[in-house]
Structures are given as structure tokens and as C-alpha cells.
């Protein structure tokens, strides 16, 4: 396979396999990836803020991919059943979190016990309970 | 035929036909989405993720939580 001009410009790069997880499991794991990979994600976003050129942030991008792959592997080892049921519920419900709270709670407790990761939504106003922790939310699904 | 319930016969026919239409429509939508409800209110982000799912699994609604990428989709 011949190299493109851009590939020749950056030189040979270490190979990191892309993450093979599809959209529903990623959405289910999203806040845990945010908690686990915070430093790498922030590094990558700051790097992108400097320059949108793809060649500029290859190293930070590799780190993000490795961290996310690591977390998904750990999630599957420790909390497979809750993880699978949560993203199956999301698949049935247009990937909307508020419709899958009953299945999300066991996943959050399992992740906290086994891996110590807590789902926090950044930007929640001070003093307000996290939306996923409210027992009887006003906006909820039609059926119980 | 002059019976008290004669108007209910075409009403029942209408209800049945609407029901059949709705059921067949539901079946066609679900059949294209691997027997799951279709996605709606899709943004550009969602469309890009669905295209990525297609590259990874071969179908727009195919899902897998396996972090190992199959070789045919090795460049996402």
C-alpha cells in the first residue's frame, strides 16, 4: 500500500487498533469514559483547540483510543450483564438516557463497586441533584 | 338489513383496516431496523455514528460491544 503525501510528512506512527465498539455501547459507557479517561480527553481537546490539522494530534488521539479500549475491556470483564442490558435498552429507545433509568441504576452501582467510577454530568447547576439520581423525575417515559 | 347494529359492521371494517395498515407499516419499519424501533430526530452526530456502525457491523443498526475491531473495518 503506497503512502500518501500526508503519511510521508508525519512519518511512521505506532499502530493502535481502533475501538470496535458501536454507538449504543459507547453511549452507555460515555460518562464512565469521561470519568476514567479525563486527562487524556482533555489533552486531546486542548491539542485540537491549537490546530484542527489531523496530523497535529495523532499522539493524543492514540492515547484517547487506548484509554477507551482499556475501559471497555474492563467494563465487559466486571459488569458485562448490566452493560449489555443497558445498551440493549438504549437501542430500543432511540438512544435516550431518560427512558432507560431502571436499567441504568444497576450499571452505575456495579461500576462504582467494581471500578470506582461515578457518573457525573458536568454543568449541573450547584445544589441541584444529578438528573439520573432523581427518584421521581417530572419528565419521564410514558410507560412505567 | 334493518337491525339495530347494522351500522357497526362498516365501522368494524374501518377499524380493522386502519389496524391492518398500522400493523403492516410498523412491520415494514421494524424489518428495516433489525426488529427494533426506528431511530428518529437524528442529528449529524447520530448520522455519523450510524455510518460508523455500518462500517463496523455491515448494518446501520448492528451493534457490538466488542472492543476488538474486525479486520474488514480496520480504518474507521
Language-model segment annotations:
Chain A
Residues 1-144:
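Mitochondrial intermembrane space
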Amino acid at each position: 500500500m503506497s503512502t500518501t503525501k500526508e503519511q510521508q510528512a508525519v512519518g511512521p506512527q505506532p499502530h493502535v487498533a481502533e475501538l470496535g465498539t458501536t454507538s449504543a455501547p459507547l453511549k452507555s459507557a460515555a460518562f464512565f469514559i469521561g470519568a476514567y479517561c479525563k486527562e487524556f480527553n482533555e489533552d486531546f481537546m486542548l491539542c485540537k483547540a491549537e490546530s484542527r490539522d489531523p496530523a497535529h494530534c495523532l499522539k493524543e488521539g492514540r492515547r484517547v483510543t487506548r484509554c477507551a479500549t482499556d475501559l471497555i475491556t474492563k467494563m465487559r470483564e466486571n459488569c458485562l450483564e448490566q452493560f449489555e442490558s443497558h445498551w440493549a435498552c438504549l437501542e430500543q429507545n432511540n438512544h435516550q438516557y431518560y427512558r432507560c433509568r431502571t436499567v441504568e441504576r444497576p450499571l452505575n452501582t456495579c461500576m462504582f463497586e467494581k471500578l470506582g467510577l461515578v457518573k457525573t454530568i458536568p454543568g449541573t447547576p450547584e445544589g441541584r441533584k444529578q438528573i439520573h439520581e432523581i427518584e421521581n423525575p417530572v419528565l419521564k417515559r410514558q410507560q412505567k | 338489513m334493518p337491525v339495530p347494529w347494522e351500522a357497526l359492521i362498516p365501522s368494524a371494517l374501518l377499524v380493522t383496516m386502519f389496524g391492518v395498515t398500522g400493523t403492516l407499516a410498523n412491520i415494514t419499519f421494524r424489518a428495516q431496523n433489525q426488529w427494533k424501533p426506528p431511530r428518529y430526530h437524528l442529528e449529524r452526530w447520530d448520522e455519523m455514528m450510524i455510518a460508523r456502525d455500518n462500517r463496523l457491523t455491515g448494518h446501520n443498526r448492528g451493534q457490538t460491544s466488542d472492543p476488538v475491531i474486525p479486520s474488514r473495518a480496520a480504518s474507521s
